[in-house]
Regions:
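Flexible, glycine/charged-enriched surface loops at secondary-structure junctions
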Residues: 103-109, 144-146, 213-231, 262-263, ...
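Flexible glycine-/small-residue-rich
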Residues: 33, 42-44, 61-63, 113-117, ...
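Long, basic N-terminal domains or extensions that often function
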Residues: 1-232
Length: 711
């Protein structure tokens, strides 16, 4: 049944349509926000997926270029694999809704958000997040929502909900907040050194709008929502769990405590073997095999209980640290000989190698998406090979997690990257995870900062990253213990991974993942305070002693840049017909040249002399030819009516036979030859921009002319 609902969001009308499309889906919604239109459809499998210990949720955010009137640039002229922005949006849709499904639910659920039309002032990403909540809430799929989301900006000291394009250009903050009526369930932010208190105020302002949207969606659910279907529960078998707990909890409590991840993993593997042997001895192989899934789930749940109990009741962590203690840290710069900049950052058993490459303007990353942005000058890429966690599996390229972590580290450094005018390089940073035991993205932030300073990139301030975790009471969710610098096991069994990157003066990036029903403002405030203390420690005590500021000189292997500005009208002359002139310069000097529409020219070279030569050639072409001025010329062609003379920069003028000498010249060859270097004066530039030259009355040529005429 078709229904239409309307509300207001940030002073603009938001419309939700249901029952109009995809009648075979479990739930559907079309969101209209201005001229932005996003369709979201959700489906669930009728039967659970067997043999898994996780909830199989998939989210796809599909960018259709027809939404902005573009044809894809690929050979096949159709959308290919999702762009990074689409993958990041898929993750942003996923993270706030995933914790709200039943923990024992194993049916496949698929959320597909398709962007149909885009007005740049109205974010399709936010529409997709709202649409996913609407479609799930009104569907028959078990879901504990609704949730909602908004973007928040900070413009001229004012908090702005869902800022327009013009406002985003002047905003110091790009924040996405998602939540329920009661709590915040997701935070994603890039910021220009925003203080903790201001960031919290922005999150609160966003959540107030979210509450209104959740109430609106709840009203839609009451009117058109379907009853939720019954599902097969995959909850842990209580009897199996109780038996394992009674016989093995004390040992597990001890075995899970180890500084070294390998030791802990070995302890748990041996314990699992002994538990299996216990069941075989007591119940026989056949019955034990039949209960294998229940046994494995019970071991997992008991380990989780031990870790959480240890942290919550004893304020003790598996590796023996205090709840606010950071793992041992170290860093090193200049670790690779021929790259432009490099660093290794180590935090406990997490280690990341970051490498910087400086390139030319033409090497910027081209973007073919729904945004107006066409290229990206600074890029960070994150790789997570299997050996970093001691596994043996082939690499198949970056997955969604790698793209998400890379984007977070990139976001953290963007505010301190020098402008193109200050540092006209394209900058690529690659972070290779060498060993992983949690917080690799935060190690990538620290490693990127160190590598950029090692490369001599004049970043405005160093940036560090740290993550906090959370363990809440089962009986009272308002009681909790917060952990600074979480390792893998604490992330895995905890309720939160609150990542914050920033300088000593403020926050530059946030990414928050949760596994419970959301965060209160008090938790968010404490997380900001904890990460600020830890960040300052890392910056002052670990990174600063290694390299306090960017190197004064670039690596000798990095390209050098010479910049100049030419008249916009001269760009066509420098390039030449079909690129003739610019290619001539490149071939003659071996440099790379980028010319901007505003006349800015960048020359990239490994050889200073060649760079100067190219600069002179460009300036010669770009300089204005002045009537009445004398130029050094070189004869390039002899014709029966005169000679063509190059007067610099590939500009040729005609020296008519009548203008060669005050005396009569019968043949041009009697006076001039190809290759002769002569002085000429520009006496005219005609209406077709043709240059006419003369040698008459020039003393510098007098002797040369007379010799030729006498001969």
């Amino acid at each position: 049944m078709y229904r239409k609902f309307e509300t207001e969001l940030a002073g603009r009308k938001l419309t939700v349509e249901t029952g109009r499309v995809a009648e075979l889906a479990n739930g559907d919604a079309i969101i209209h926000y201005g001229d932005t239109v996003v369709m979201v459809n959700v489906t669930a499998s009728k039967e659970p997926r067997e043999g898994i210990d996780f909830f199989p949720l998939s989210v796809d955010y599909e960018e259709k270029l027809y939404a902005v009137g573009k044809i894809p640039g690929s050979f096949q002229k159709r959308e290919g694999k999702p762009a990074d922005k689409a993958i990041l949006t898929s993750r942003a849709i996923d993270r706030p809704i995933r914790p709200l499904f039943p923990k024992d639910f194993r049916n496949d659920v698929c959320v597909v958000a398709t962007v149909l039309s885009v007005e740049q002032d109205n974010s399709p990403e936010v529409c997709a997040m709202i649409g996913a909540s609407v479609a799930l809430s009104i569907s028959d799929i078990p879901f504990g929502g609704p949730t909602a989301a908004v973007n928040v900006g900070y413009v001229d000291g004012q908090i702005v909900i869902n800022p327009t394009v013009a406002q985003r250009e002047h905003s110091r903050l790009k924040l996405t907040v998602a939540g329920t009526m009661e709590k915040v369930t997701m935070i994603e932010a890039g910021a220009d050194e925003i203080p903790n208190d201001t960031m919290l105020d922005c999150i609160k302002a966003g959540h107030e709008e979210i509450k209104k949207l959740c109430k609106f969606i709840e009203g839609i659910k009451e009117e058109v929502g379907k009853p939720k279907f019954e599902y097969v529960s995959f909850a842990t078998d209580k009897d199996v769990y109780a038996e394992i707990k009674e016989n093995f909890k004390e040992r597990m409590y001890q075995d899970v405590q180890a500084v070294d991840k390998e030791v802990r993993d070995a302890n748990m593997d041996k314990l699992a073997e002994d538990i299996q042997a216990y069941f075989v001895e007591k119940y026989g192989e056949e019955e034990t095999e039949a209960k294998s899934t229940e046994i494995a789930n019970s071991i997992h749940d008991l380990e989780k209980e031990c870790v959480r109990e240890m942290i919550f009741k004893e304020h003790k962590r598996p590796d023996g640290r205090r709840i606010d203690e950071i793992r041992p840290l170290s860093c090193e710069v200049g670790v690779l000989p021929r790259v432009h900049g490099s660093a290794i950052f180590t935090r406990g058993q997490t280690q990341v190698l970051s490498v910087v490459t400086l390139g030319t303007k033409s090497e910027e990353q081209e973007l073919d998406g729904l945004d107006e942005e066409e290229s990206k000058r600074y890029m960070h890429q994150y790789n997570f090979p299997s050996y970093s966690v001691g596994e043996a599996r082939p690499s198949r390229g970056p997955g969604r997690r790698e793209i998400g972590h890379g984007a977070l580290a990139e976001k953290a450094l963007v505010p301190v990257i020098p402008s193109e005018d200050e540092f006209p390089y394209t900058i690529r940073v690659v972070s290779e995870v060498l060993s992983s035991n949690g917080s690799t993205s935060q190690a990538s932030i620290c490693g990127s900062t160190l590598a950029l300073m090692d490369a001599g990139a004049p970043i405005k301030k160093p940036v560090a990253g740290i993550s906090t975790g959370l363990v809440t009471s089962k009986e009272n969710p308002d009681e909790y213990v917060m952990l600074t610098d979480i390792q893998g096991i604490e992330d895995f069994f905890g309720d939160m991974d609150f990542k914050v990157g920033g300088t000593k003066d403020g926050i530059t990036a946030i990414q928050v993942d949760i596994k419970n029903d959301g965060l209160t403002y008090d938790i968010i405030k404490e997380a900001f305070e904890r990460t600020k203390v830890a960040r300052d420690y890392i910056l002052d005590e670990i990174m600063k002693p290694q390299i306090a500021e960017p190197r004064a000189e670039l690596s000798k292997y990095a390209p050098r840049i010479i910049t100049t500005t030419i008249n916009v009208d001269k760009i066509k002359d420098v390039i030449g017909p079909g690129g003739k002139m610019i290619n001539k310069i490149i071939d003659a000097t071996g440099v790379k040249v980028d010319i901007e529409e505003d006349g800015r020219v960048c020359i990239y070279t490994d050889d200073a002399e060649n760079g100067k030569k190219a600069l002179k050639m460009i300036e010669d072409i770009a300089k204005d030819i002045e009537v009445g001025k004398v130029y050094d010329g070189k004869v390039t062609r002899i014709m029966n009516f005169g000679a063509f003379v190059d007067i610099g920069g590939g500009r040729e003028g005609l020296l008519h036979i009548s203008k060669i000498s005050n005396k009569r010249v019968e043949k041009v060859e009697d006076v001039l030859a190809v290759g002769d270097e002569i002085k000429v004066k520009v006496y005219e530039i005609d209406n077709q921009d043709r240059i006419n030259l003369t040698m008459k009355d020039l003393e510098e040529n007098k002797e040369n002319k007379e010799e030729h005429v006498e001969e």
